[in-house]
Amino acid sequence: MGEERVFVSTLSKLFRINHGNKFEVIGYKSLGLLAGLYSVVQKEQRIMHDKRSEESSLEQSYQTLQPMDPDTARTVLVEVKKILDQLGVIFFLRQGTCLGAIRDKGFIPWDDDLDLGSVIGLHGFTEEQVDPVIVAFKELGYYTKLERCKEYLYIAMMKSNIRIDWTCYRIVDDNIIHFPGVPIPVHLITRLKEIEFAGETFLVPNPPEDYLAAKYGPNWMIPKSSGYEKDILAMITDLPIQQRQSAIGENSDSSTTRVRILDQHGEPVKNALVKVVRHGIFRTNEQGYALFRLPEENWYSLVINHSSHEEVLYQERLARGITYVYRPDPSTTSGRWLALSQE
């Protein structure tokens, strides 16, 4: 029978030779190569944990729409600017971030994200630059998520519980299309204007007042924490009335999207109107289903109408071939995002 011995290997691992003359690891010392390897493993575990945490924070940010901490938002915005500047990417403040910078001279108190934009084909920016930029942000600790759509590339990033929405627009008929379908004349972006904001120099559309009126309507100077969605939808040209009333019918295929409308008692609503902004208005059948076809999986705005009830669902993620359910919230008729659930 073998003699039991204990020794330390050159890798600082503690071994024991048992009675069967087999090596058995019984511990290690935090020295040398093993300590370094253990440190690397710990670092990778922390990175994976942080990535899962930031991914969860991103999804949660869409659900809760919690206002940003202004000091943290300022720090993240300045860091993002530094990164994009070093990569040679021209970007501008857009939507709520631009609105706050121009109207409020700071972040809007209830704003929940940082809105940045670039235009493919302007200022030397190309679509091929997007992926390397995403890699750079990942290496610097940002969680990133890329979505490619017909009219833009949408890059959501998360760091320090701050969501950054960087949208890279394609030019469509001399416009760039802001969600949920607002056409912004590209000439407002061609020669960007410098402003002082958050202790740094940033670019905004030029003139910013015209841009904000195009996005938010003529009353953009009036602060609104809710209800602004209707002002934005009013800026979008709807489909002609004869197309708006078109329907697929009861027979549908795997590409048909359905939204079932329920009332406050959970009962299906017949003849409710479901407006999918830019894509038509559809009437529900006896089972409460509205049926329509979408061009792609994307974010969409919907307006639900029946009897005296109306609610704007400003930002919903819809895919082809999926059935969703709408349930009203008696406490509100505006401001909900991701209110639909899958059936």
Predicted regions and their residues:
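Helical scaffold of the NTase/Pol beta-like nucleotidyltransferase catalytic core
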Residues: 9-94
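Conserved catalytic core of two-metal-ion nucleotidyltransferases
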Residues: 62-87, 133-180, 196-202, 226, ...
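Active-site nucleotide-donor binding segment shared across nucleotidyl transfer reactions
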Residues: 81-114, 120
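Short Pro-Gly-centered beta-turn/loop motif in secreted/extracellular proteins
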Residues: 124-127, 291-302
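Short acidic, Pro/Gly- and aromatic-enriched capping/linker segments at domain boundaries
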Residues: 178-194, 280
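Short, ordered, surface-exposed loop/turn motifs in non-cytosolic proteins
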Residues: 256-257, 265-278
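Short, acidic Ser/Thr/Gly-rich low-complexity loop/linker segments typical of extracellular
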Residues: 279-293
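Conserved structural position at the C-terminal beta-strand
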Residues: 304-306
